[in-house]
Amino acid sequence: MKTEIHYGKAAVSTYRTYATPLRVTPIPESPFTGRENIIMGAAIDVRVLGESFLAAYTGGDNRLVVATDTMKNFIHRESLAFDGPTLEGWLFFIGRRFLETYPHMERLEMSGREAPFLAARVPDGDSGGWRDSAVLFDRGHGDHGTAVVALDRTGDGAIVATEVHSGRADLEMIKVSGSSFAQFARDAYTTLPERTDRPLYVHLDIGWRYADPMIAITPDAARYVASEQVADLAATVFDGFVSLSIQHLVHEIGQRALARWPQLTEISFEAQNRLWDLSHTSDSDERVKVYTDPRPPFGRIGLVLRRD
């Protein structure tokens, strides 16, 4: 009988204060150039892989089992020593410390979902202007960065990142005009009308991989692709591009992203069509409408673009 096991701890809420600031290379499609990382927050998962813990499954032998509560404490304690500016670097640091501390762990996977805290805007003294507070922050509940880092041991005992996958999740964008969906296949089952100019509301997750995974991990972030910049590039394309479908839209975003960041080798999309249902239209101005949330089910669109 063959076995494949894993175990770990999920959604370990971790908030590190006064981490290393992030500074990234500016791009035309985004105002984002970095963040101070006064609060660097994430929900972190650790998943341990390998056969070292098989005895716990087959015979209840727990002598090698690192309790998942211990894993939670480990993540919190070791995060104090992390000195990098990126989520990917944080996950790699914690994963490497796990493998260094517990030699019987063969390999593992770390994943994280950013918990963004945005500096509150406060009056700038008597100048009449505004500034970012250095002590007050608003918890963001919208789109956020994500990352997955897989770590393994080499034959000579070195600990390496075998996979790094970065992302921006839970984007929700609506464009009130400048999108269409027409000339699609029609048959006896089709009831959807063609729309040459329609609102388009999409929920979107974007992921990407680097040709060199260490770009996302090393403290030097000059070639790092910030998830905020990816979100802004997607919004810039959506704003100016007349799309003929969601498929058309995500393909254009992907092409633009790969052209902007040659250090990326792949970009992927998972999109949902969440266009509102129309309730009422004004008799005097057809632009004035009332909508409501759509009923399920929702259309899903996926795309992966990889360089040759």
Where are these regions (language model features)?
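N-terminal intrinsically disordered, cationic/polar leader segments
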Residues: M1-D308
